[in-house]
């Protein structure tokens, strides 16, 4: 997916659930076209606290599971580095900003959710902020610069992507953070391939056990 891409979908009256569905469909379509060589699977709206999740955990491991959470988009890549094994499992939290949301949502919204994903054993963590067409670019730059400073200041291993939907007639995106970025999924994969950008809690055995459970639920065979 790149910032000049377009879709047949209109973004009139776009809501966050619809945005997630559109992004999922675009990524899946590009995967089917062979545009992302290391991408093996895409999932969306995955609840990590279902009965199936809890039952498998209680059967194989001890200790409580974290509270309920849902991941907007999950990307599963083949990991050429094999840092843990052949799979690289990434989580994406997506937040949509309409003009009305600017007075309701904090600039850092979604960051706490991404950090929560880390304790479930994801290899990669990512936050996407998507801004509606009517929001001025100086406002977007103020939001994204502040979030980037927060992430870099604390050296959080989170890939932050901020884009604006160009217009309401097609799904065309302009990237603000990282600047002039194209081919988002490939950049995401490259970022997560670097071992120091991986999820730090994976050094703990308990988190790796949760990752094994995650692989089972997502049907990752490697």
Kindly give the residue locations of the regions a language model identified:
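Charged, often low-complexity linker/regulatory segments
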Residues: 1-49, 187-222
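Short, charged/polar micro-motifs that form catalytic or ligand-binding hotspots
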Residues: 9, 13, 63, 100-107
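Secondary-structure boundary elements
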Residues: 29, 33-34, 80-82, 123
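Active-site metal-binding core of divalent-cation-utilizing nuclease and nuclease-like domains
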Residues: 36-90, 106
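Short, flexible loop/turn elements at secondary-structure junctions
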Residues: 77, 95-98, 131
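Mg2+/Mn2+-dependent nuclease catalytic core
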Residues: 82-122
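Nucleic-acid nuclease catalytic cores
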Residues: 103-107, 115-171
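Non-catalytic C-terminal interaction segments of nucleic acid-processing enzymes
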Residues: 145-222
């Amino acid at each position: 997916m790149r910032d000049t891409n377009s879709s047949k979908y209109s973004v009139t009256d776009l809501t966050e659930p619809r945005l997630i569905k559109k992004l999922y469909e675009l990524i899946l379509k590009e995967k089917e076209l062979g545009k992302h060589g290391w991408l093996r699977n895409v999932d969306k709206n995955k609840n990590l606290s279902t009965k199936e999740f809890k039952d498998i955990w209680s059967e194989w491991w001890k200790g409580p599971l974290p509270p309920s959470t849902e991941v907007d988009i999950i990307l599963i890549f083949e990991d050429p580095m094999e840092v843990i094994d052949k799979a690289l499992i990434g989580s994406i939290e997506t937040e949509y900003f309409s003009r009305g949301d600017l007075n309701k949502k904090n600039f850092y919204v979604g960051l706490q959710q991404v950090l929560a994903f880390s304790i479930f054993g994801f290899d990669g963590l990512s936050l996407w902020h998507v801004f509606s067409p009517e929001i001025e670019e100086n406002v977007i730059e103020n939001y994204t610069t502040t979030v980037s400073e927060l992430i870099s200041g604390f050296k959080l291993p989170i890939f932050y992507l901020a884009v604006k939907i160009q217009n309401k007639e097609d799904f065309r995106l302009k990237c603000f953070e990282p600047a002039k970025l194209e081919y988002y999924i490939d950049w995401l994969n490259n970022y997560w391939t670097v071992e120091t950008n991986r999820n730090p809690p994976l050094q703990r055995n308990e988190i790796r056990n949760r990752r094994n459970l995650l692989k089972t639920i997502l049907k990752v065979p490697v």
